UniProtKB/Swiss-Prot annotation:
Stored Pfam families: CBM_10, Cellulase
UniProt superkingdom: Bacteria
Catalytically driven reaction(s): Random hydrolysis of (1->4)-beta-D-mannosidic linkages in mannans, galactomannans and glucomannans
Boundaries of every CBM10 domain copy: 339-377
Activity versus pH, per record: Optimum pH is 6.8.
Residues in the signal sequence: 1-35
The encoding gene: manA
Keyword Signal attached: yes
The protein's name: Mannan endo-1,4-beta-mannosidase
Length: 383
């Protein structure tokens, strides 16, 4: 989410969007190495915990960098049932720098409230205009604060390198810039799961992330990068939502909806389709945002004035509506939650196997995970 941004998409831009979204993804090769077990990591195109249990994010964004005195919001969000909080930080390029000690304290609050912390640098929003900083500069920030209790925090923290890098210009540079930033963090010894946002203000209408995700994933020596799409006005139909998310899931690439709302100045996102499709596919989603929005998008607040007892219509929808957080969130097993198979549901009503064919030794399409039968996606049993 950008601060009071203009999200006008030109006719030419939409033409590129159509072309980009037609590109087929070449998924990661079956023989590639993936991140070694330990901490949140990617396995068979899914986000899992260190013990191999599937973890599907169901959470909320919190604008910490603009409201550093509202850290109680993490507890309030957790109390509503979220299993993840995406926390807005600043590298100092556009707003006051979030210090290493603040990062450490935020991780501590997430752990105390039994939620996974997705930490993101917001200064990169729309790089190329508005004074936004580069992904390379965001990488420098992460390297600089990695002493902030990073050791042994891989079970609890996902590092979202930079929010919505690249706006609607020069976005072709996203692929190389993202690969370079991943390399910088890995070279500095960060072993956490990484999250990378799409260009085009996070909405990837050009199909840049969709077309290049496989090569970006392969560039990570840990094979531990999760892709994040932000769904606002570009995703105003169920078909667009399903098409985008299925492109990643079908090609074994990890995807989450890192931001979305129920309305926006650039169009009317189909939040019902976003939540239903995410639930069906076992894909994580993080709604924007708890409170404190301005610049004409105050309707994206889930609660009024940071008061957890004063829900807005958007807050009620995402928390308690169909496929909402309260009904679908599962606490991470590292906190004692039950976990469970969350790879989505097959047409026959059985869950899909999170570990794919590895759970099906006899090759009949049926596997066994979490003490129950599961279906291997695309097998003869997938009907």
């Amino acid at each position: 989410m950008r601060n009071a941004r203009s999200t006008l998409i030109t006719t030419a831009g939409m033409a590129f969007a159509v072309l980009g979204l037609l590109f087929a993804l070449a998924g990661p090769s079956a023989g590639r190495a993936e991140a070694a077990a330990g901490g949140i990591h990617v396995s068979n195109g899914r986000v899992v915990e260190g013990n191999g249990s599937a973890f599907v994010m169901r959470g909320v964004n919190h604008a910490y960098t603009w409201y550093p005195d509202r850290t109680g919001s993490i507890a309030d969000i957790a109390a509503k049932g979220a299993n993840t909080v995406r926390v807005v930080l600043s590298s100092g390029g556009r707003w006051t720098k979030t210090s290493a000690s603040e990062v450490s304290a935020l991780i501590g609050q997430c752990k105390a409230n039994k939620v996974i912390c997705v930490l993101e640098v917001h200064d990169t929003t729309g790089y190329g205009k508005d004074g936004a900083t580069s992904l390379d500069q965001a990488g420098d920030y992460w390297v600089g604060v990695k002493s902030a209790a990073w050791r042994a925090q891989e079970d609890y923290v996902v590092v979202n390198i930079g929010n919505e890098p690249f706006g609607n210009t020069n976005y072709a540079a996203w692929t190389d810039a993202t690969k370079s930033a991943i390399g910088k963090l890995r070279g500095a010894g960060l072993g956490h799961a990484l999250m990378v946002d799409a260009p085009n203000w996070g909405q990837d209408w050009s199909g840049t992330m969709r077309s290049n995700a496989a090569s970006v994933f392969a560039s990570d020596p840990d094979r531990n990068t999760v892709f994040s799409i932000h769904m606002y006005g570009v995703y105003d139909t169920a078909a667009e939502v399903r098409d985008y998310l299925n492109a990643f899931v079908g090609n074994g690439l990890p995807i989450v909806v890192g931001e979305f709302g129920d309305q926006h100045s650039d169009g009317n996102p189909d939040e019902d389709a976003i939540m239903a499709t995410a639930q069906s596919l076992g894909v994580g989603y993080l709604g924007w945002s708890w409170s404190g929005n301005g610049g004409g998008v105050e309707y994206l607040d889930m609660v009024n004035g940071f008061d957890p007892n004063s829900l807005t219509s958007w807050g009620n929808r995402i928390l308690y509506g169909s496929n909402g957080i309260a009904a679908t969130s599962r606490t991470a097993t590292v906190y004692g939650g039950g976990g469970g198979s969350t790879g989505g549901t097959a047409p026959n009503g059985y869950p899909y196997c999170v570990n794919g064919g590895a759970s099906d030794p006899d090759g009949d399409g049926w596997g066994w995970e979490n003490s129950r039968s599961c279906v291997v996606r695309g097998s003869a049993a997938d009907h």
